[in-house]
Amino acid sequence: MSTSRDRVRQALSHQGSDRIPVDFGATAVTGIHCRVVEALRKHYGLSYKPVKIVDTFQMLGEVDRDLADAMGVDCIGVGGTRDIFDHDTECMHEQVTPWGQKVLVPIQLDLTQDKEGDVYVYAGGDKNISFLILS
């Protein structure tokens, strides 16, 4: 049985392995929405905790080690210390999304919902620069 590292290296070298390497959540392309991450944790019987948002533009949740192990994931993400909106991802706080889910987001992040139900986020916490993230 190959290790995750072996599987990925063999795939990148176009060699066979015991199975195709699996990636859920290591990049913005393979990420999983925070609602789905919470549902997967419940499905696999993992302890409840607010999902850490790793991509605030797409609201992608962190696939942490216990969930990755449960799903047989081979790849792990290597994130930076700032998100796409220039928020510090080292300092997080709990916030409730407009759909009622508790998540961990950068402390500068302020999800604002307007009267039509659209949700906005602000670059670097600057209320003059807004981005629509949910309509």
Locate the predicted segments by residue.
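Catalytic cores of TIM-barrel enzymes
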Residues: 1-135
